[in-house]
């Protein structure tokens, strides 16, 4: 009986781990594909066929922060990538990653990364120039 209980525990634990992995992967895949769009709670609940409570509960359970913070983090990470890898203007990048308010994007970027988006791009450009020159 103890062996049976241990086996069931391991199976259950693995199932929960798989559920978490699937939820986070599916959510992130959808969010990354639609960063520039409105990612309201209503839209996400319709897309994933779950209630608001279940969405909040799942995000709190499987992620380190809430859904709004998670989306913001994905948007900012994509903005950093675009600043590094493209010549799009900061304004274009803010639109492309779903920040409808350019000034808000600039404030939140600086708050998260300690530097402005323009300075970040310049620093990355200087780093790559120095790296290639060596």
Where are these regions (language model features)?
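Short amphipathic alpha-helical segment with a characteristic S/N-K-E followed by hydrophobic residues
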Residues: 55, 66-67, 71, 116-117
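Key DNA-contact positions within bacterial/archaeal DNA-binding proteins
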Residues: 53, 102-103, 118
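Short hydrophobic/aromatic patch on the recognition helix
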Residues: 55-59, 104-105, 109
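An amphipathic alpha-helical interaction segment
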Residues: 1-19, 54-56
């Amino acid at each position: 009986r103890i062996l049976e209980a241990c086996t069931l525990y391991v199976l259950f634990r693995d199932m929960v781990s798989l559920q978490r992995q699937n939820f986070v992967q599916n959510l992130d895949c959808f969010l990354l594909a639609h960063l520039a769009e409105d990612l309201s709670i209503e839209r996400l609940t319709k897309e994933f066929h779950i209630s608001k409570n279940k969405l909040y509960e799942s995000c709190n359970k499987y992620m380190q922060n809430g859904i709004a913070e998670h989306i913001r983090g994905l948007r900012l990470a994509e903005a950093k990538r675009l600043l590094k890898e493209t010549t799009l203007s900061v304004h274009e990048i803010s639109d492309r990653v779903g920040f409808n308010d350019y000034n808000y994007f600039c404030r939140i970027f600086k708050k998260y990364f300690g530097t402005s988006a323009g300075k970040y791009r310049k620093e990355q450009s200087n780093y790559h120039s120095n790296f290639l020159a060596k």
